[in-house]
Curated annotation (Swiss-Prot):
Protein name (record): GTPase Era
UniProt keyword annotations, A-Z: Cell membrane, Cytoplasm, GTP-binding, Membrane, Nucleotide-binding, Ribosome biogenesis, RNA-binding, rRNA-binding
Domain KH type-2: residue ranges: 201-279
PANTHER family assigned: GTPASE ERA, GTPASE ERA, MITOCHONDRIAL
Gene Ontology molecular function, alphabetical: GTP binding; GTPase activity; ribosomal small subunit binding; small ribosomal subunit rRNA binding
UniProt subcellular location: Cytoplasm; Cell membrane
Originating gene: era
Location of region: G3: 58-61
A GO cellular component entry from the record: plasma membrane
Phylogenetic lineage: Bacteria, Bacillati, Bacillota, Bacilli, Lactobacillales
Organism: Streptococcus pyogenes serotype M5 (strain Manfredo)
Annotated segments matching region G4: 120-123
Role of this protein: An essential GTPase that binds both GDP and GTP, with rapid nucleotide exchange. Plays a role in 16S rRNA processing and 30S ribosomal subunit biogenesis and possibly also in cell cycle regulation and energy metabolism.
Length: 298
């Protein structure tokens, strides 16, 4: 008998949702940074064994939106409640429950589907603090299970996976066993470039960046994959920061991104990066759609 199911990973920004998904999948399919709202699109991670398939849906961190992009991200996250059989509600062990958590809990109660509370970052707290956190969240909602983990170190992750697989129902194998995500390579390439911008820039720049892969094709002469990517920003000052003195920052972004892209593709890559200004794109629906943030996602 083959079992399968869809599982959403929900929570506030920066609680470790993408770190958890990457750990389960054994490779990077969701970019990570210490900046809030790193994940902007729903990202599917397909975990398959001989007898089971769990389709995880990593979601943008739920926050109070200030732009049309923020609205898209939050609606995209909540839309998964209509698509899954189980929700992993992830919270950090080293932060007390806040208004953002309460807002999510109210939506989860209304959804009327099983919710597993996943308390991440247990490596950062004393066991007594962890017990207090569990009691506090349990007082707010009747969770199906509570599982403390460290997504970064992998502590207790196998326990969580076993809990999910034990509760799967008989079903189809929705995806081939060698497929690990639903996103095309172009999307993953654009995310890897954006990840390096997030790592290397500060203040308002990370939130104002989108990356569009203009072309991606193999050069038969050099046997390299030639990629042309444009980094979009909202202001000229941001363009200057990303390019850097004599192009140094842009070169660094390109060099770091190329390494990750080559690992993912298993090919040598020639990465060409450009920077363009598109004023206030985060509040323009046409621009959002052009840059891959389309309401059709939800």
């Amino acid at each position: 008998m083959f079992k399968s199911g869809f599982v959403a990973i929900l929570g506030r920004p920066n609680v470790g949702k993408s770190t958890f998904l990457n750990h389960v999948m054994g490779q990077k399919i969701a970019i990570m940074s210490d900046k809030a709202q790193t994940t902007r699109n729903k990202i599917m991670g397909i975990y398959t064994t001989e007898t089971e398939q769990i389709v995880f849906i990593d979601t943008p961190g739920i926050h109070k939106p200030k732009t049309a992009l923020g609205d898209f991200m939050v609606e995209s996250a909540y839309s998964t409640l209509r698509e899954v059989e189980t929700v992993l509600f992830m919270v950090p062990a080293d932060e007390k429950r806040g208004k953002g958590d309460d807002m999510i809990i109210e939506r989860l109660k209304a959804a009327k589907i099983p919710v597993i509370l996943v308390i991440n970052k247990i490596d950062k707290v004393h066991p007594d603090q962890l017990l207090e956190q569990i009691d506090d969240f349990r007082s707010q909602m009747d969770f199906k299970e509570v599982v403390p983990i460290s997504a970064l170190e992998g502590n207790n992750v196998p326990t969580l996976i076993k809990l999910l697989t034990d509760n799967l129902e008989e079903g189809f194998q929705y995806f081939p066993e060698d497929q690990i995500t639903d996103h095309p390579e172009r999307f993953l390439v654009s995310e890897m470039v954006r990840e390096k911008v997030l790592h290397l820039t500060q203040q308002e720049v990370p939130h104002s960046v989108a990356v569009v892969v203009e072309s991606m094709k193999r050069d038969e002469e050099t046997d390299k994959v030639h990629i042309r990517a444009t980094i979009m920003v909202e202001r000229d000052s941001q363009k200057g920061i990303i390019i850097g003195k004599q192009g140094a920052m842009l070169k660094k972004i390109g060099k770091m991104a190329r390494r990750d892209i080559e690992l993912m593709l298993g090919d040598k890559v020639y990465l060409e990066t450009w920077v363009k200004v598109k004023k206030n794109w985060r509040d323009k629906k046409l621009d959002l759609a052009d840059f891959g943030y389309n309401e059709k996602e939800y």
